[in-house]
Amino acid sequence: MISTEDRKTPLYEAHKSLNAKIVSFHGWLLPIQYTSIIEEHNATRTKAGLFDISHLGKIEVAGRSSKEFLQKIFTNNIEKAVPGGIVYSPLCSDNGGTLDDAFIYNAGKDRYVLIVNASDRKSVV
């Protein structure tokens, strides 16, 4: 159900102009479909696809110990992300389970930007 409190991504008007079917997803108005699933699948396989990720959570981690901190909470090797690079990794909870998965972007100079799922943004922080 769409709520008046749902937020719009910067691409919302473009989605509407392309006749997207819009749904509410964790407080965001997002496109779920434009044409048929088969037509969209074939277009993605033979041409290109675009996914609006504006709704995802963005968390900045910065400082001299930022890499060491991230290395402790993620299962993948953070050092694989050279400046300007990205590592994808599960994020561990305190008991060792999976809290979320995230992209860790190395912004350089002891600064990282985590891209986490919209539904888990508050629990990650």
Provide a role label for each language-model segment.
Residues 1-125:
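Basic, glycine/lysine-rich polyanion-binding surfaces/domains
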